[in-house]
Amino acid sequence: MKINGEETDILRSYRSMDAEGRLAIMLGNYAVFPKIIRRAEKKIQYKIKTEQEYLRSHSRDELGVRVQTSGTSDPTFNEASTNIMIEDALKSGVIDKGILRGIKDAAVYEEDIRTVSNMRMDFELLEEIIEDLSEEDSKILKQYLVDGRLFKEIADDEGRTYEAIKKRMERIRAQIREEILECLEMNCRGGK
């Protein structure tokens, strides 16, 4: 199952899928899935920082509001701190409420952050499972998933029949499915 489109569509689709659907999305987009995750992270980070800047600029413009500070402000430190908090949230799925304080649609950002964190965790597990396959199985699967080669092409290179490669791929997928589904199901519990 290929997912083409914007990250919001991918995030929404991934979040709403069951374990089987999530596995299908990861396998169908295996070669580009890390890029999908990185792009989604960058967009979320950009949107949150833009919202924060909007809130800061509007709070300064309000008349009648006097904010007294110590006079020491370090915008570079503040931005670095915000970046670290957002990056940590995207990796762990745990959101410091301070980074979303006052932001409109904070709940949407929370869901997106948790989804991206789950996507990363799920994909890292899938990569580990694929790496742990026998060398030959891993090679054949990567030719299909990463290089986009057809079963016929793989069969020709391996000196085997199309049917033999097809059956082997079915066996490999079943092995991956068996290993990963329990974990994906646990991750789906809080993902909807």
Q: What are the residue ranges of the model-derived segments?
A:
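Alpha-helical hinge/cap motifs
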Residues: 133-134, 159
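Short, locally clustered residues in the helix-turn-helix/winged-helix DNA-binding domain
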Residues: 131, 145-146
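N-terminal interaction/assembly modules
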Residues: 1-129, 182-191
